[in-house]
Amino acid sequence: MIINQRDDRHAQVIDAARRMLTAIRTAPKAKGNDLIEGAIVEGDDLRRLSDAMLELYAETSRPVYQRDAANILQGDAVVLVGIRPQPMGLNCAHCGFPTCADKPAAVPCAFNSIDVGIAAGSACSVAADCRVDTRTLFSAGMGAMRLGLLPGCRLVLAIAVSATSKNPFFDRK
């Protein structure tokens, strides 16, 4: 049997995306509290995510949503990393409020945001090891939250993933 890379490209990207999910799960977390969630979006769900981003563009007139909605369709998948918000109870004031009790519920604990960033960075590191191209997008994360793709998560980043001869996430207009 001969497996042509061009024919197997999607499966290779999904394999890398699965490894990225492992990196998300094993990334260090504040106080060891695992509040992180991850998922892979592909196929028809990738189109749904793009459509949700176009809805955000229509509502906000922010061009980033329109540009990124088209851009994610140039890849094979999007890896989502999100967090179920929970204050760490450290009263560190890193969020801008003196104590956790003073912090409004709508304001995320700074450590929740840090944990999502660390997990996304860990996932992108694995993607680089697999030699697939990525782009971390807040816009696609907003679309994912709109669709409820990571239930309970109020902060979501999306990592678009591709394995083509030219990185589709690099020269964007």
Regions of interest found by a model, annotated:
Residues M1-K173:
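Acidic, surface-exposed loops and disordered segments
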